[in-house]
């Protein structure tokens, strides 16, 4: 399972009539591998929530999203598992099938919410318009396999 994390001043998602937004916090692009499990979601949720990627008063990255009472916009993103080795069209065969991936995606978001964070979700499997203002920028890729960070 992969999660691309971006530190944001604000971010929003729109899909049809649906609109969701967050203020200062994180934008998460969440990719679920064909072998991902709830253990991977647990490991990533725990690490991301505790990661000190926000600046303290001295300008050092010393604060987590929990420390700043930040918000999270979580977007499903199967294209994080694109294979571009052959041809010109990416293959997405390493991404989990949508029905199972959606379950793990929602489970991951529930784990974030259980840690006391405001979590806004995108629309799984739908075309979305994502807007954000990066802060930094700070962009970090997190990955878990077999319930452990890699």
Curated annotation (Swiss-Prot):
One GO cellular-component annotation of the UniProt record comes to: cytoplasm
The molecular function terms of the Gene Ontology recorded here are: D-tyrosyl-tRNA(Tyr) deacylase activity; Gly-tRNA(Ala) deacylase activity; Ser(Gly)-tRNA(Ala) hydrolase activity; tRNA binding
Q: Which InterPro entries match?
A: Daa-tRNA_deacyls_DTD (IPR003732), DTD-like_sf (IPR023509)
Domain of life, per UniProt, equals Bacteria
- A Pfam match is Tyr_Deacylase
In its keyword annotation, does this UniProt entry include Hydrolase?
yes
Q: Does the record carry Nucleotidyltransferase as a key word?
A: no
Annotated keywords = Cytoplasm, Hydrolase, RNA-binding, tRNA-binding
Q: Which reaction does it catalyse?
A: glycyl-tRNA(Ala) + H2O = tRNA(Ala) + glycine + H(+); a D-aminoacyl-tRNA + H2O = a tRNA + a D-alpha-amino acid + H(+)
Q: Which family does it belong to?
A: Belongs to the DTD family.
Instruction: Cite the record's note on assembly.
Output: Homodimer.
HAMAP family cross-referenced by the UniProt entry: Deacylase_Dtd
Q: What is this protein called?
A: D-aminoacyl-tRNA deacylase
Lineage of the species this protein comes from: Bacteria, Bacillati, Bacillota, Bacilli, Bacillales
């Amino acid at each position: 399972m992969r999660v691309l994390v971006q530190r944001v001043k604000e971010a929003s998602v729109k899909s049809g009539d649906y609109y969701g937004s967050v203020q200062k916090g994180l934008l998460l692009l969440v990719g679920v591998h064909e072998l991902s499990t709830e253990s991977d979601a647990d490991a990533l949720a725990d690490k991301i929530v505790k990661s000190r990627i926000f600046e303290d008063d001295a300008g050092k990255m010393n604060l987590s999203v929990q420390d700043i009472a930040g918000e999270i916009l979580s977007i499903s993103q199967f294209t994080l598992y694109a294979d571009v080795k052959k041809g010109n069209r990416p293959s997405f065969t390493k991404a989990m099938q949508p029905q199972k991936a959606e379950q793990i995606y929602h489970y991951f978001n529930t784990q974030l919410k259980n840690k006391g964070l405001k979590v806004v979700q995108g629309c799984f499997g739908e075309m979305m318009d994502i807007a954000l203002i990066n802060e930094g920028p700070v962009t970090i890729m997190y990955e878990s396999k077999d319930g452990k960070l890699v």
